[in-house]
UniProtKB/Swiss-Prot annotation:
EC number: 2.7.7.60
Residues with site note (Positions MEP for the nucleophilic attack): 152, 208
Provenance organism: Trichormus variabilis (strain ATCC 29413 / PCC 7937)
Function recorded in the entry: Catalyzes the formation of 4-diphosphocytidyl-2-C-methyl-D-erythritol from CTP and 2-C-methyl-D-erythritol 4-phosphate (MEP).
Keyword terms of this UniProt record: Isoprene biosynthesis, Nucleotidyltransferase, Transferase
Taxonomic lineage: Bacteria, Bacillati, Cyanobacteriota, Cyanophyceae, Nostocales
InterPro entries: IspD, IspD/TarI, IspD/TarI_cytidylyltransf_bact, ISPD_synthase_CS, Nucleotide-diphossugar_trans
Designated name of the protein: 2-C-methyl-D-erythritol 4-phosphate cytidylyltransferase
Pfam families linked: IspD
Coiled-coil spans in chain: none
GO molecular function, one term: 2-C-methyl-D-erythritol 4-phosphate cytidylyltransferase activity
GO biological process: isopentenyl diphosphate biosynthetic process, methylerythritol 4-phosphate pathway
């Protein structure tokens, strides 16, 4: 299975002016934990890191220390996540029929989750990892006035990996460019094109490291795994 890792962002909410994936959790850069999970996932055979060239020397140094046995390629990132994934799709080997896309900042995803998504995407056109929403969700207007309360039994918190048929995802990205759609994940492009996206049960610990508080939580989770 082919894995694309969007890793081109700057950690503004983290309060830093460089790629947040270079920040460390337990003496390892965030991206290193993501790559180690991909290395340990038996279904993953190829990894593409979508990032800016200014980060490539740092990423190459990290890779040298990890000594992964799977091929890793660097792909030029875009100005948005959507553009970055589009670039990643164009750079996939011709043999790629399905692809997993996994945020580099979700460094706590386990090899089991990557394997589950890789196996499931062989039997559907699109999928996302997701977990049921536990909190009550309110929909509010621009003035902060509550408009409705959706039934949380129908609500899922989207995660990554997200998996897709490569040709279908390319077509959806092309349609997104034509229509001027701006989306925050690839599943939304499938939805806009009327293509079903299946849910694979995600992991409660699969958080996206976005804030300094998330770094502390990630460290706690990694420590607890060592002690279990």
């Amino acid at each position: 299975m082919y894995l694309l890792i969007p890793a081109a962002g700057v950690g503004k909410r983290m309060g830093c002016d460089r790629n947040k994936l270079l920040l460390e959790v337990r003496s390892q850069p965030i991206i290193a934990w993501t790559l180690l999970a991909a290395q340990a996932a038996s279904e993953i055979s190829w990894i593409g890191i979508i990032s800016q060239p200014t980060d490539w020397p740092d990423f190459k140094s990290i890779l040298a220390n990890l000594q992964l046995t799977k091929p890793v390629e660097f792909i030029l990132g875009g100005s948005t996540r959507q553009e970055s994934v589009y670039n990643g799709l164009q750079a996939l080997p011709k043999a790629a029929e399905q692809v997993l896309i996994h945020d580099g900042a979700r460094c706590l995803a386990t090899p089991n989750l990557l394997n589950s998504c890789a196996q499931a995407i062989r039997h559907c056109s699109g999928l996302i990892a997701a977990v049921p929403v536990k909190d009550t969700i309110k929909v509010a207007d621009e003035d902060g006035i509550i408009q409705s309360t959706p039934d949380r039994r129908n609500l899922w918190a989207a995660q990554t990996p997200q998996g897709f048929n490569v040709e279908l995802l390319k077509q959806c990205h092309a349609e997104g460019v034509r229509q001027g759609w701006e989306v925050t994940d690839d599943a939304a492009l499938f939805e806009k094109c009327g293509i079903e996206v299946q849910i694979v049960e995600g992991e409660e610990t699969n958080l996206k490291v976005t804030t300094p508080q998330d770094l502390a939580i990630a460290e706690f989770i990694l420590n607890s795994r060592d002690n279990s």
